[in-house]
Amino acid sequence: MAKVEQVLSLEPQHELKFRGPFTDVVTTNLKLGNPTDRNVCFKVKTTAPRRYCVRPNSGIIDAGASINVSVMLQPFDYDPNEKSKHKFMVQSMFAPTDTSDMEAVWKEAKPEDLMDSKLRCVFELPAENDKPHDVEINKIISTTASKTETPIVSKSLSSSLDDTEVKKVMEECKRLQGEVQRLREENKQFKEEDGLRMRKTVQSNSPISALAPTGKEEGLSTRLLALVVLFFIVGVIIGKIAL
């Protein structure tokens, strides 16, 4: 038995073209027209359902009306040497009187009432002459970004060289110098006192007393070392600001 000819008009008729790059969703449109005087049910199928999203994928087209179907290709790693084997099929039939349950309508449809059209998928990459245009766009974006960043850098440099900040750092440096000098004098005084205690300790032969001065001296040395390190860091900061 001869197959019933498709009554719907398809635009495009034979190929669905998807233009890359394919790093994002690529959409192409399929227009279905119903030139008849009867309502027509349609359904869109594909051999690769996981790779495409079709909206709407089924429905009813009124007599003399048309509908646009969006076919969305999901992102994937494109290989130019690999030919696409994906295909789509538009299946249709004249709508019965009762269309309240479309699932049952399609399930009960007779093979001789079904009409179908097949389309193959074609993947295209941007033409070579489009690439310089993309390069120019990238240059414009880069230039704009550079101009945007320049005031930020200048503002940062201006803030670093603020006279008030430099004055505060210098005052802190002087304060640290005075603190270091004071600790040196205290350290000298402790050493003199420790020498006196050591002599008394030797005379009394007390091991506990001999350990006491050492703990004080170590505590003082630690404080002195910490201040020296802090003073060094402040000096480095001043040096960078001066440059």
Curated annotation (Swiss-Prot):
Residues 159-196 form a coiled coil. The modification Phosphothreonine is found at residue 150. Keywords: Acetylation, Amyotrophic lateral sclerosis, Coiled coil, Disease variant, Endoplasmic reticulum, Host-virus interaction, Isopeptide bond, Membrane, Neurodegeneration, Phosphoprotein, Transmembrane, Transmembrane helix, Ubl conjugation, Unfolded protein response. The keyword Isomerase does not apply. It is a single-pass type IV membrane protein. The chain crosses the membrane at residues 223-243. The record marks 43 as: Involved in binding the phosphorylated serine of the phospho-FFAT motif. This is Vesicle-associated membrane protein-associated protein B/C. It comes from Homo sapiens.
